[in-house]
Design a protein with these regions (language model features):
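Compact, glycine/acidic-enriched structural inserts
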Residues: 88-105
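N-terminal domain-onset segments
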Residues: 1-55
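Generic marker of "main functional regions" within proteins
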Residues: 30, 40, 78-80, 85-86
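Amphipathic, interaction-prone secondary-structure segments
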Residues: 44-83
């Protein structure tokens, strides 16, 4: 079933985070995730129904749940531009890394 959903433009937050980590060529490990008002481990988040729910990532409304995820070096969060959903990240601690604009442009 997941192959058909992927072909139709559906995804989950864990899939989008994994794609981002692959594209950045990092072995970053997510330690904690807040889904709604619950803080949990990554392992528990992978079983949370809202976090693992399939949603349409294409243009339209924001369908994925709100979340914040932390690794040792980065903070991950949902990004939406014109209805398209993706994952953004910023450094967890102060450093000399500037943040690009999120969204369009």
């Amino acid at each position: 079933m997941s192959k058909e959903l992927i072909e139709e433009g559906y995804t989950t937050w864990p899939r989008l985070i994994a794609e981002l980590l692959k594209n950045k060529r990092t072995k970053d490990k997510i330690e904690q995730v807040a889904v709604g008002d619950e803080l949990m481990t990554w392992r528990k988040a992978l079983k949370h129904p809202a976090f693992t729910k399939w949603f349409y990532e294409g243009f339209g409304g924001a369908d994925g749940c709100k979340f914040t995820a932390w690794s040792k070096e980065w903070v991950y969060f949902p990004v939406q531009y014109d209805g398209h959903e993706s994952v953004g990240r910023v450094p967890r601690n102060p450093c000399a890394v500037s943040t690009e604009h999120f969204g369009g442009g």
